[in-house]
Amino acid sequence: MKTATAVINRRALRHNLQRIRQLAPDSQVVAIVKANAYGHGMIEAAHTFCDADCYGVARLSEALALRAAGITKPIVLLEGFFSADDLPLLVEHQLETAVHSPEQLAALEQATLSQPLRVWMKLDTGMHRLGVLPEHADAFWQRLTACRNVVQPVNIMSHFSRADEPEAGTTERQLTCFDAFTQGKPGAQSIAASGGILLWPQSHRDRVRPGIILYGVSPLDNEDAAHFGFQPAMTFTSHLIAVREHHTGEAVGYGGTWTSPRNTRLGVVAVGYGDGYPRCAPAGTPVLINGREVPLSGRVSMDMITVDLGPDAQDKVGDEVILWGPTLPVERIAAHTGASAYELITRLTQRTALEYVDGE
């Protein structure tokens, strides 16, 4: 019997990439495959996104793994390089890099490289995490344009902090700041990630950088991805390993936090926080068994959860349990837990098997 398994639908991944192209028809697509492709398996996802124009990762190790797997299209290091010692590897593997700090700029100026690198100057328009502040941006850009180790023209990127909020004045101010700096400068521009693609079409520019939306999960709190025409690619499943008679007033699980208000049947599911199911999921969080939703009962354990099947349930050991997927969106589970959907799909552990299908 299978236990925790994440089934990844390649057809859904391809559909989502094409949906991005429909929403941003004049932009190239940087498929973001960092963090193991948001839990979907980086190598498999990258090959499935073979029609993307480029890939985006957060770590040099991710980029090198893609190259080792035969990915030849451009790859952008979204956080840049972390040490001057990394620069020869970037040249060897033809990687593009963000440049956001004085230390990175100095390393580029001082390096002896066999050929120049394509770079993306990261402008801090309001995220205040990485990036060159606007008051320092012109001087920084001038040094990059004069650097012998940089392919010209210099590309420019930034990142929205609140693009998932339709009325956020912050996004408009960030876009105004970006426009003021990029006006008249050559090179590609990129500022829109998933939220910007969905809600701010004026931000699409030369390249868009879809992340979570590529996997059929919404970046918005109040709408799931299906509302925008995307298909969830992951179905997280396990199976019932026990069905037990449970009596009124009996508690279940660690701490006895849930007590049955009636005689019922409890199902024990072979999944827990050791597989990546959220430990913070409260009683009442739904799972799907035999086409109906049933509520979580008691605390999530490392290896198991218990669910209230109901007094007349006919479910049996071996029946499949859907924890999230197209028929039970992960956004709903996130709402129950107080965690974000980003967390849920990226926290699956090595014990959860990844399987790939090309079906509906």
From Swiss-Prot:
Its cofactor is pyridoxal 5'-phosphate. It holds the Pfam family Ala_racemase_C. HAMAP family: Ala_racemase (MF_01201). Its EC number is 5.1.1.1. Keywords: Isomerase, Pyridoxal phosphate. Pathway: Amino-acid biosynthesis; D-alanine biosynthesis; D-alanine from L-alanine: step 1/1. SMART domains: Ala_racemase_C. This is Alanine racemase. It comes from the Bacteria. GO terms for biological process: D-alanine biosynthetic process. Catalyzes the interconversion of L-alanine and D-alanine. May also act on other amino acids. It catalyses: L-alanine = D-alanine.
